[in-house]
Curated annotation (Swiss-Prot):
This is 1-aminocyclopropane-1-carboxylate deaminase. It comes from the Bacteria. The modification N6-(pyridoxal phosphate)lysine is found at residue 51. One of its GO terms (molecular function) is pyridoxal phosphate binding. The lineage of its organism: Bacteria, Pseudomonadati, Pseudomonadota, Gammaproteobacteria, Pseudomonadales. The gene is acdS. Keywords: Hydrolase, Pyridoxal phosphate.
């Protein structure tokens, strides 16, 4: 496998830390050892997160092409757009963000706090759009790029989750290589890796990266899209493409993609009671914050898998914490009593 042939622009501190979730493990019976790899604190750029790791492999292309404006898209409380705004500010580039109405959640301050507030503070041109949720290429995003061109600028397109970019999966191939180095220091290997999936490139990169040592099927994706067929198909497609890019040496098959689907509902961006319990439990036991859109759902999935005995006793499970806590501000009413 050859990741080093791709240019990488450093935006993170270095390897994100792996920390034990001792109190949560004990609370769940102590038969499974839980750890977290903290992508939520991987960078000094506006709280970082998984998209910052991905952007390290996209930004060299933007700079080589002489682009002056990063153009991206997401929901109103998109972590992606906040991280793109931060990177643009860091590089001295302009930033246009399309924020679509992906979540059927009504709150007076939903479009004024959290991620979108930070993007505005960082100088991004934030454009609200009424279109609903979808993980594909969006007309509103294409229009934003055309607007930049018409103004004489040179846009660099960054799709939702970085996922439709040809290099969108590379960052999390690097994640797997990083974990292998950290495992040498820890003195053990993780039996399972749990990760949230929506647009697909995070899990796709992990599938390829861990396929290098035979652990692709040990990457357990927790769907948060509530459109699992689309998400799984996109993970598989991106993983196959990424495997070719890094010269994995074998084909990625449908069996390599494991996606657990019950935890995404009632729909994208809306938490259920299990999501909220997981957020409170992880917060109160570990001081680790997760959000109602993504990490609260993947944390819920991991907790339920432990409770149901789906991990063999003695398993060491690595939770990939992808970030997202800034969105908690937009859901403050749900936590008004804690």
């Amino acid at each position: 496998m050859n990741l080093n042939r791709f240019k990488r622009y450093p935006l993170t501190f270095g390897p994100s830390p792996i920390t034990p979730l001792k109190r949560l493990s004990e609370h769940l019976g102590g038969k499974v050892e839980l750890y977290a790899k903290r992508e939520d604190c991987n960078s000094g750029l506006a709280f970082g997160g998984n998209k910052t790791r991905k952007l390290e492999y996209l930004i060299p292309e933007a700079l080589e092409q002489g682009c002056d404006t990063l153009v991206s898209i997401g929901g109103i409380q998109s972590n992606q757009t906040r991280q793109v705004a931060a990177v643009a500010a860091h590089l001295g580039m302009k930033c246009v963000l399309v924020q679509e109405n992906w979540v059927n959640y009504s709150d007076a301050v939903y479009d004024r706090v959290g991620n979108i507030e930070m993007s505005r503070i960082m100088g991004a041109d934030v454009r609200l759009d009424a279109a609903g949720f979808d993980i594909g290429i969006r007309p509103s995003w294409e229009k934003a790029m055309n607007d930049v061109v018409e103004r004489g600028g040179k846009p660099f397109p960054i799709p939702a989750g970085c996922s439709e970019h040809p290099y969108g999966g590379l960052g999390f191939v690097g994640f797997a290589e990083e974990v292998r180095e950290q495992e040498k220091q820890l003195g053990f290997k993780f039996d399972y890796i749990v990760v949230c999936s929506v647009t697909g490139s995070t899990q796709a990169g992990m599938v390829v990266g861990f396929a290098a040592d035979g652990r692709s099927k040990n990457v357990i994706g927790i769907d948060a899209s509530a459109k699992p067929e689309k998400t799984k198909a996109q993970i598989l497609r991106i993983a196959r493409h990424t495997a070719e890019l890094v010269e994995l040496g074998r084909e990625i098959t449908e069996d390599d993609v494991v996606l657990d689907t019950p935890f995404a509902y009632p729909e994208y961006g809306l938490p259920n009671e299990g999501t909220l319990e997981a957020i409170r439990l992880c917060g109160s036991l570990e001081g680790v914050l997760t959000d109602p859109v993504y990490e609260g759902k993947s944390m819920h999935g991991m907790i339920e898998m432990v409770r149901r005995g789906e991990f063999p006793e003695g398993s060491k499970v690595l939770y990939a914490h992808l970030g997202g806590a800034p969105a908690l501000n937009a859901y403050s009413f749900l936590f008004r009593n804690g």
